Amino acid sequence: MRFTPAIVIAAFCSLAVAAPAAKAIARSPSEAVEDYVIPIDKKRGEAVEDYVIPIDKKRGEAVEDYVIPFDKRGEAVEDYVIPIDKKRGEAVEDYVIPFDKRGEAVEDYVIPIDKKRGEAVEDYVIPFDKRGEAVEDYVIPIDK
């Protein structure tokens, strides 16, 4: 199949125009595509999401810290919702997930462990690439 000079020139021009546009998107090595979705304030190096959760400049605390009020002893009110066993210093939720004699939570049996390699079976569900990257890394593309 032969191409006319006009087709070759048009193809070359479209590549020359597309290449700089692609480079304009690329920022720096190892930046995930999600970094483009959450824009960064270049002056302060903060993500725009930092403005959504405003920061108290005097104390350096997020406004969300006021929503979960703190006790005089430095404990969040949420600590009262999950009561603490004073004798053992454990949250009551520790009783909901019962523990085995070997100090393993029952949830460890739900996600069985490969004894030889010490890996959870879930590691087989997300297969790994030869370079040690999870296949999910390809779903969220990384800007090399």
Curated annotation (Swiss-Prot):
Keywords: Repeat, Signal, Virulence. Pathway: Mycotoxin biosynthesis. Residues 19-35, 42-50, 57-65, 72-79, 86-94, 101-108, 115-123, 130-137, 144 form a propeptide. The keyword Repeat applies. PhomA' is processed by several endopeptidases including kexin proteases as well as the cluster-specific S41 family peptidase phomP1' and the peptidase phomG' to produce 5 identical copies of the hexapeptide Tyr-Val-Ile-Pro-Ile-Asp and 3 identical copies of Tyr-Val-Ile-Pro-Phe-Asp, that are further modified into phomapsins A and P, respectively. The timing and order of proteolysis of the phomA' precursor and PTMs are still unknown. Two tyrosinase-like enzyme phomQ1' and PhomQ2, catalyze the chlorination and hydroxylation of Tyr, respectively. Residues 1-18 form the signal peptide. Ribosomally synthesized cyclic peptide phomopsin precursor; part of the gene cluster that mediates the biosynthesis of the phomopsins, a group of hexapeptide mycotoxins which infects lupins and causes lupinosis disease in livestock. The phomA' translated product contains a 5-fold repeated peptide embedding the hexapeptide Tyr-Val-Ile-Pro-Ile-Asp and a 3-fold repeated peptide embedding the hexapeptide Tyr-Val-Ile-Pro-Phe-Asp, that is converted into phomapsin A and phomapsin P, respectively. This is Ribosomally synthesized cyclic peptide phomopsin precursor phomA'. The gene is phomA'.
